[in-house]
């Protein structure tokens, strides 16, 4: 799948490029050139676990850049904690997103990003440096997600005296 800048749809890039670049040079945001209809892609979605669903969705965006085995590795590494679906009412279920290592829903995204970027920097002779500025749980999720990822250094900036006690922990 190709991605374009929200400020210019004319230049298409692949997923790896968009991921590693972060932002287009025209200060837009990268968007997929098409949005797959995952309801049609995943028959019986209500009977699948989160890793199976994640694989199908990730594959629809990553298959041009990664082998299926690499996508499976990314998903298995990124979602290595419980994420139970809890029945609330008849026909109403909720996916609990707070069971990750930092208890934040951002664990899913940060770990997926770190494992995907790790695949991109393998066999690269340069380190990737990532600068993150946050006042909340993004920092802990990113720090945990990128911990011990070879070839990637993460610097997290927090505003002085603007972070809650629970988020510091």
Task: Label every model-predicted segment.
Residues 1-169:
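PLP-dependent amino-acid enzyme catalytic core
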């Amino acid at each position: 799948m190709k991605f374009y800048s929200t400020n210019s749809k004319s230049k298409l890039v692949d997923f790896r490029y968009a991921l590693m670049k972060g932002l287009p040079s025209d200060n837009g945001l990268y968007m997929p050139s098409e949005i797959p209809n995952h309801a049609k892609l995943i028959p019986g979605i209500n009977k699948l676990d989160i890793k199976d669903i994640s694989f199908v969705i990730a594959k629809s965006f990553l298959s041009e850049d990664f082998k299926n085995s690499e996508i499976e590795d990314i998903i298995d590494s990124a979602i290595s904690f419980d994420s139970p679906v809890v029945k609330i009412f008849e026909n109403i279920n909720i996916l609990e997103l707070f069971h990750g290592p930092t208890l934040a829903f951002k664990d899913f995204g940060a770990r997926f990003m770190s494992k995907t970027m790790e695949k991109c920097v393998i066999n690269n002779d340069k380190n990737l440096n990532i600068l993150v500025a946050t006042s909340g749980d993004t920092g802990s999720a990113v720090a945990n997600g990128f911990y011990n990822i070879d070839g990637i250094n993460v610097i997290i900036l927090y505003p002085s005296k603007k972070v809650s006690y629970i988020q510091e922990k």
